[in-house]
Amino acid sequence: MEAAGSPAATETGKYIASTQRPDGTWRKQRRVKEGYVPQEEVPVYENKYVKFFKSKPELPPGLSPEATAPVTPSRPEGGEPGLSKTAKRNLKRKEKRRQQQEKGEAEALSRTLDKVSLEETAQLPSAPQGSRAAPTAASDQPDSAATTEKAKKIKNLKKKLRQVEELQQRIQAGEVSQPSKEQLEKLARRRALEEELEDLELGL
């Protein structure tokens, strides 16, 4: 069945070419006015409520469609009507991949549970006093390393601020008449450097 044709221009005006009906009969060629739009091409009006409900997701946020979709038994060969061999192969491949993924997730969950149970066994109160004290000493090390890192950052920021202040004094004194792009960027970052320095000093 051919779709309704768009208006075509001729010497005598516009016309819609003849089209075939679903029952096999033909519609006659019709002349139309300038600017005529066929009924099939007129967009359907939708108010804002209809648009809102169409765009609204069917599932709650965070819930994947796979979790709610019912598991359908795989059809036998040739049981899927209207599908080509390639489409059937793709379906089989997807089904196999899904089964492998589910199996992998189950194995990962089992390994995680085993690991948790082993950790709980290792943390029983029967452990000697010395072995309990060891993790505490180890946990102090990251804190001291973080403090050292902050101190280095503070020193670095103070150095950068000192350079910015010196540059500003040189510009005000007339030593630098035309500051370069990099020098102007340094001056612009002064406030950001000061704020970062304050945050680090408060965090110590």
Curated annotation (Swiss-Prot):
The modification Phosphothreonine is found at T72. Residues 82-116, 145-204 form a coiled coil. SMART domains: Mago-bind (SM01273). Residues 86-97 have a biased composition (Basic residues). Residues 1-33 are annotated as: Required for interaction with MAGOH and RBM8A. Disulfide bonds: none annotated. InterPro entries: PYM1 (IPR039333), WIBG_mago-bd (IPR015362), WIBG_N_sf (IPR036348). The modification N-acetylmethionine is found at M1. GO terms for cellular component: cell junction; cytoplasm; cytosol; exon-exon junction complex; nucleolus; nucleoplasm. The modification Phosphoserine is found at S6, S64, S117. Residues 138-147 have a biased composition (Polar residues). It is found in: Cytoplasm; Nucleus, Nucleolus; Nucleus, Nucleoplasm. Signal peptide: none annotated. Residues 1-32, 55-151 are annotated as: Disordered. Pfam families: Mago-bind. Residues 98-118 have a biased composition (Basic and acidic residues). Residues 152-204 are annotated as: eIF2A-like. Belongs to the pym family. Key regulator of the exon junction complex (EJC), a multiprotein complex that associates immediately upstream of the exon-exon junction on mRNAs and serves as a positional landmark for the intron exon structure of genes and directs post-transcriptional processes in the cytoplasm such as mRNA export, nonsense-mediated mRNA decay (NMD) or translation. Acts as an EJC disassembly factor, allowing translation-dependent EJC removal and recycling by disrupting mature EJC from spliced mRNAs. This is Partner of Y14 and mago.
